[in-house]
Structures are given as structure tokens and as C-alpha cells.
Amino acid sequence: MAEHSFNESAFPVVVAHRGASSTHPENTLASFEAALALGAPVVELDVRLSADGIPVVLHDPDLSRTTDGSGWVHELTFEEIRAANAGTVERPQRIPAFREVLDAVSGRGGLAVEIKNIPGEPAYDDEREAIVEAALAEVQASGFRGPVLVISFNPRSIAASKRLAPTLPTGFLFTRAVDPDAALAHALDAGHEFVFPGHRALVPAGPAFVERAHRAGVRVGTWTVDDRETFGFLLDWGVDAVASNDPAMGLEVLADRPGSGSG
């Protein structure tokens, strides 16, 4: 899977968080298409497993927040999940299979694939990591053309990805509850190419943290930044990837910076 690595010239990069989710239903094909139409070089999405083992694209462990349906994703078949409307009455959207998104984005952009396998959730799998296996199998089978980054809050999940697909870049997501330098040390230990603190964790750590990560050979991404000022100063710090629900704004901020790449 070496062909899925990021080109060094791509950075800094704007990541469309769940697609163009400020203007479209999150994690839907409409949202991803809108992000690509804007010129977003990378779209971020969340992957979970249905009851019948299909990787589906949904942030939450249940359907209630983002659809007109209900129920735990891991207890519903793919067809049952597809019956829910993730859009509006006028413009219905279905929860996509991961394979559908791979096919839609292939050759047009990159993917940041967040593995949702969170301790405390009903579907948590602390041994088999079936979701990682299934997601990687879909990337391979789809013949996806473009960079792919596997990210997770769960160190086990990205460790499994690194074990199963060692050439595929991985990134460790973390919140303010985790010490940034401890997260960086873990990433170095585990061979991850990225750390992804939330911006509320990154801002207090300051530009010195970004410098330390870069000196260690680790790239720094952050999420979720929806205001121009924060987006701008994070780029000033040398942050490599900034995820936003408003990729149009992020792309504008990046374009206004002389000498910056746009991915």
C-alpha cells in the first residue's frame, strides 16, 4: 500500500472534516462531493462495522443524532442502516458504505480514515480489531488511487493498521486529557507518522510542540478548526494538516498565504 503515502509537497493540507459538513449532512456522499468540488485535497471520515461486517461511514455508535433512524450500528445490518435518512426530506441521503466513498474519492483526493473502536462503547473490540481488518481490505480491494491516512483515538487500532499495512501512514488522535509530549513519545515508539491533537490540546502546547514533533520526524495535524484566525496562526506554527467542517474557509486562508501549498 506504499502508493497511498502522502507526497511531501502536499503540506500544509486542508482536511475536510466529515466532508463539507458545515453545509452538507456529515459523512454523506453529498458532503464528500461538495468538499472535492471545493478543491479539498483530503476528506476525513469515520468507519464503523455493521452487524453483517460491512464497514460503514458514520461518526456515532448509533443512528439517532444524524439520521431519522435509531439503533446501535453494530446491531444493525447494512440494509437496515441504509434505510435511515441522513439528509432531509427534500434531499435524502443514505449512510454510505466505506467502499462507496473509496470509489467516489479515488483519483480525486486523499482520505483520512478514522477507525471508530472506542473503549466504553457497546461495540468495542479490544482483541480482534475486525474493523481495521475490514477497512484495510476495502482499501486494497477498491484499488483506491490517492493517499490514505489511518487515524484513531485508540492506540490498538492504529497499531493494528501498522501491523497489517506497515507502509500505510497512521496518526494518533488525542484530546486535552492526554499530555501532548506523552502522545508524541507514543507515536515515535509505535512508528506513527502523525500526531493529531484537538486544537484545544494543541494551542496550549504552542508552536514549540510542533517544532519538537518535526525535529523527531513526526507531522502534526489538528481538528476541528472553523475560524480563520485560529486556522491562520496554526499554519504560522507549521501545523501540517488542519481539519475543518468548513473546508472552503480553510482553503481560502491557505490560498492567502504566499508560498503555501494547497495539497
Task: Describe the role of every protein-language-model region.
Residues M1-G263:
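Phosphate-group recognition and catalysis centered on beta-loop-alpha active-site segments
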